[in-house]
Amino acid sequence: MKSTSAAAGRAAAGPRGPAFRRVTLISVVVCVVALLQACAGEARRDLPPWVSTQAPAAAPMHIRTLGPDQQFSELAADTVARRLSVDASAGSLHILALSGGGAFGAFGAGALVGMSQAGERPDFAVVTGVSAGALIAPYAFLGSSWDAKLAESYTSGSAAHVLHLRALGAVFGSSLYQGAPLARLIDQYVTDDLLQSVAAEAAKGRLLLVATTNVDSGEPVIWDLGSIARYGAENAHVLFRDVLVASASVPGMFPPVVMHFHKDGQTYDEAHVDGAVTLPFFVAPEFAAVAQDGAPQRGTSVYVLIDGSIDELPQATRLRTGSIVSRSVATGLHMMMRTTLELAGTTAAQHGVRLEYAALPAAYPQHKAFDFSAANMRPMFEYASACAERAHLWTVWSQDSMASAVVADGSRAVPCPADDAAIERLARAAP
């Protein structure tokens, strides 16, 4: 009897038993998921031949705008530099670079408002932005008269509901969260009044530049939003908004923004995502392009406003997949930011350019990059504003020795970014 029962059990577990059925069910589910995933994505046109057959060549930065036919065209960096040469030679050229950082954009927004309140905010001839910095950039470009709108966007809680999960979005779509809420939020602030104001300032020769990442070519794309705004047509308004949405679309979290264009009688498209994928921040035009006849531009000042920190406090990482991946990604982003900052500081010194930078101290108590609630962002905004008002926001990167951080008023009374030991160590480590 025992042998008969054992044989029956083995038969049940055989080719048609429960174990077999479970394996079959799992295999079917995996195949269906893979098939649906392959079919669910948005249909894409073939890549342009110059993208699919050629590796990117090292070349001077080109800045994209709209051409007279409302199609994309590029503006060479040396042309941009010539616009600014008068300001540079007069010793009044100020450049602002705003980094990415998600909800940490509240730090950058508060810093600008605080500078205005202290009467210490320069008139920036060039404003560049990446990701969260791209969303701040138009207000930084327009100046203190737009501070109320800037403050509202980061303290009112209007962004609190931007994260809407997609049903099985990570498996069947291009992102975990819906893209429409982010686009609606940005569209709410990209008004006709804002575009007209940007266009008026751009007409004076000032530059508003924002970076996205072309995921097809793997390269950053710099957009001249001032020139785009000057066209004033409806598709210019849409492109202005779409560039901002793309620059803030963290891959995997939000879907890419697909932009269509025509060339040589053919229609192509490009998928653009967060500019911070390729550029933590950028200074434009290149220092060498601004310099005239190789002469140092000692009247040029660059301000790098980092929406987040450039260092991490040591901590014991849980030996779990999620914790290890999260910590590793954060460490990589911090190192990328530090490396870019060191390169910018070194290059600035070589060309006689003054560079100052500010970042959220590593010891700041709340680090929630994707918590867009007012409860998370308002304290950061107010913190940065207070530090700016008290002249403790910026660390000066000395163009002579680059050996230590210098605070403008020499005081260490307020525990603000310029007092943070981690930032000072970075400055001392510079060659």
Please identify what each model-predicted range represents:
Residues 1-21:
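N-terminal secretory signal peptides that target proteins for export/translocation
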Residues 35-38:
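C-terminal motif of bacterial Sec signal peptides marking the signal peptidase cleavage site
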Residues 21-31:
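Sec-dependent N-terminal signal peptides
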